[in-house]
Amino acid sequence: MEVENEAHCCPGSSSGGSREYKVVMLGAGGVGKSAVTMQFISHQFPDYHDPTIEDAYKTQVRIDNEPAYLDILDTAGQAEFTAMREQYMRGGEGFIICYSVTDRQSFQEAAKFKELIFQVRHTYEIPLVLVGNKIDLEQFRQVSTEEGMNLARDYNCAFFETSAALRFGIDDAFQGLVREIRRKESMLSLVERKLKRKDSLWKKIKASLKKKRENML
């Protein structure tokens, strides 16, 4: 198994030099964001959770044989823009937008949460994963798998269907987000290295031209 929890509750700073990933859970109230988070960090399904409460969780995991320290913010279900929400939107490195497959309105509201990210970050190039939760309640399904896949394609992000009750697909969702964060960081690093090489080449050309001018004098 590629995702392995090493600790359910970690100290305030990452241990062993692990890379810290700040993850923000978004989605309408009642879609199971907290249950998904709790299953990931502690393999437990909560009996009750107040959807108006925002909470933070930390855990140490290994993903693709690399340590990862996840700092997960589980947000309330409101899609309104607030000063506090702006603060954690700015700090988040990756986002999981969650909806319930048994609630079409929560699926439609996914667009609102994606727009909230854009309002703060002014770009759509932010690591993102779309999650359709509660697939164990298949008899009450209102949103098809195909609809979820199509929306994720529009968002240019990975898509996972999960069941917090059965702990199905939970690790895959967080794993996918961390991989996307790493991928984008790797791309950015590659661009920066290319720019540095171009800058270095440009300086060499200018130095060569300067030397030629000096020799002509």
From Swiss-Prot:
Q: What is its EC number?
A: 3.6.5.2
Q: Where does GTP bind?
A: 27-34, 74-78, 133-136
Which biological process terms from the Gene Ontology are attached to this UniProt entry? Answer: adenylate cyclase-activating G protein-coupled receptor signaling pathway; maintenance of protein location in cell; negative regulation of neuron projection development; positive regulation of MAPK cascade; positive regulation of neuron projection development; positive regulation of transcription by RNA polymerase II; Ras protein signal transduction; regulation of calcium-mediated signaling
Q: Which InterPro entries match?
A: P-loop_NTPase (IPR027417), Small_GTP-bd (IPR005225), Small_GTPase (IPR001806), Small_GTPase_Ras-type (IPR020849)
As its record notes, the protein acts as a catalyst of: GTP + H2O = GDP + phosphate + H(+)
**Tissue specificity field:** Expressed in ganglion cell layer (GCL), inner plexiform layer (IPL) and inner nuclear layer (INL) of the retina. Expressed in retinal ganglion cells (RGCs). Expressed in horizontal, bipolar and amacrine cells, but not Mueller glia, of the INL (at protein level). Neuron-specific. Expressed in ganglion cell layer (GCL) and inner plexiform layer (IPL).
The family database entries (CDD domains) matched by this protein are listed as:
Rit_Rin_Ric (cd04141)
Entry's Gene Ontology molecular function annotations:
calmodulin binding; chromatin binding; G protein activity; GTP binding; GTPase activity; semaphorin receptor binding
Mainly resides where? nucleus
GO CC annotations on file? cell body; cytoplasm; cytosol; dendritic tree; Golgi apparatus; membrane raft; nucleoplasm; nucleus
Activity regulation per the record? Alternates between an inactive form bound to GDP and an active form bound to GTP.
Q: Keywords in UniProt for this one? A: Calmodulin-binding, Cell membrane, GTP-binding, Hydrolase, Membrane, Nucleotide-binding, Nucleus
Q: Which Pfam families match?
A: Ras
Q: Where in the cell is it found?
A: Nucleus; Cell membrane
Query: What does the sequence similarity comment in the record state about its family?
Result: Belongs to the small GTPase superfamily. Ras family.
Q: What else is known?
A: Shows rapid uncatalyzed guanine nucleotide dissociation rates, which are much faster than those of most Ras subfamily members.
Q: Which NCBIfam families match?
A: small_GTP
Quaternary assembly: Interacts with PLXNB3. Interacts with AFDN, the C-terminal domain of RALGDS and RLF, but not with RIN1 and PIK3CA. RLF binds exclusively to the active GTP-bound form. Binds calmodulin. Interacts with POU4F1 (via N-terminus); the interaction controls POU4F1 transactivation activity on some neuronal target genes.
What is the recorded function of this protein according to its Swiss-Prot or TrEMBL entry? Binds and exchanges GTP and GDP. Binds and modulates the activation of POU4F1 as gene expression regulator.
- Name this polypeptide is given: GTP-binding protein Rit2
Species, as recorded? Mus musculus (Mouse)
